[in-house]
Amino acid sequence: MENFTYYNPTKLIFGKGQLEQLRKEFKRYGKNVLLVYGGGSIKRNGLYDQVTGILKEEGAVVHELSGVEPNPRLATVEKGIGLCREHDIDFLLAVGGGSVIDCTKAIAAGVKYDGDAWDIFSKKVTAEDALPFGTVLTLAATGSEMNPDSVITNWETNEKFVWGSNVTHPRFSILDPENTFTVPENQTVYGMVDMMSHVFEQYFHNVENTPLQDRMCFAVLQTVIETAPKLLEDLENYELRETILYAGTIALNGTLQMGYFGDWASHTMEHAVSAVYDIPHAGGLAILFPNWMRYTLDTNVGRFKNLMLNMFDIDTEGKTDKEIALEGIDKLSAFWTSLGAPSRLADYNIGEEKLELIADIAAKEMEHGGFGNFQKLNKDDVLAILRASL
């Protein structure tokens, strides 16, 4: 392992009925609150009324930013920054999934920065201060509820970056599985693809002596693979929703990658795709990840083989390690497809036309690190993976 320091100050409040904890949690930060949410599903399922009721009963003055996009955009962040400054906001509360939380992180950091907020999100500068914020999670997927990272898209320039800082951890996150009951099947699938991808990207590294971390990765993956088909048959099953909700948090709260840094090439490539084509993030991952695996397989065949044997039932008799690994990759792609995820860029009507642009965007992100830590990739490599994904 490499030396490491683990820091995660987020208070995780998990379980049925835990929304009541909001009463005491937000008040220590102030009563002038900006409520941030997405397209309105929290109004349809009653969560909006519950949250605003609690806030107002506890004396909060509630302002709102609604309409956060699935790939949150700079323009929406800037609108939120303006609201915070106009109303002298003390505290932000994100009610939604990863996109809402990512947008809230960006607003919280942007308010405290005197320059162009895009400087932070494009990693020209690091956020050194942020307004306090908490989350009420409604979707198991990104892990943003318990990490400092955020992804913001600049639609004007076709740029999309992952950024983060020690000041952008949520102060608390409330996770009640019942708040995920109304998540539709396709979004449930995307969430599970996303969390599995997070685990893969932490697993693929070149650091020696990480047996415990490897086994923790296997445990999360095995749990999602076992639970996913059952959940899709019973979307309001509390125990199944509970399991997936917790898996999504563990997949990206830093627990799995203590002592090394993984390879985030697939996420970087997908961010480039969805910076040009406004597609679901996890849909892009389901397409790209198996092809990244096939492309980088020879870097460490044994590591691929070990992963696949810990996920799927594969008959190894008479097969080479590479054949076993390739069969596992095929099984992964088939598993995601069986859940309803896409398998080709053509499923989103994406062809050859803008692959050069996408590869250029991905190559620019390489400059910021986190790209190719398992196998170094260049623009030509990215193009090859994209073309294999058509």
From Swiss-Prot:
GO terms for molecular function: alcohol dehydrogenase (NADP+) activity; butanol dehydrogenase (NAD+) activity; metal ion binding; methylglyoxal reductase (NADPH) (acetol producing) activity. SUPFAM superfamilies: Dehydroquinate synthase-like. GO terms for cellular component: cytosol. It is an enzyme of class 1 (oxidoreductase). Pfam families: ADH_Fe_C, Fe-ADH. GO terms for biological process: 1-butanol biosynthetic process. Keywords: NAD, Oxidoreductase. Pathway: Alcohol metabolism; butanol biosynthesis. Its EC number is 1.1.1.-. Belongs to the iron-containing alcohol dehydrogenase family. This is Probable NADH-dependent butanol dehydrogenase 2. It comes from Bacillus subtilis (strain 168). The lineage of its organism: Bacteria, Bacillati, Bacillota, Bacilli, Bacillales.
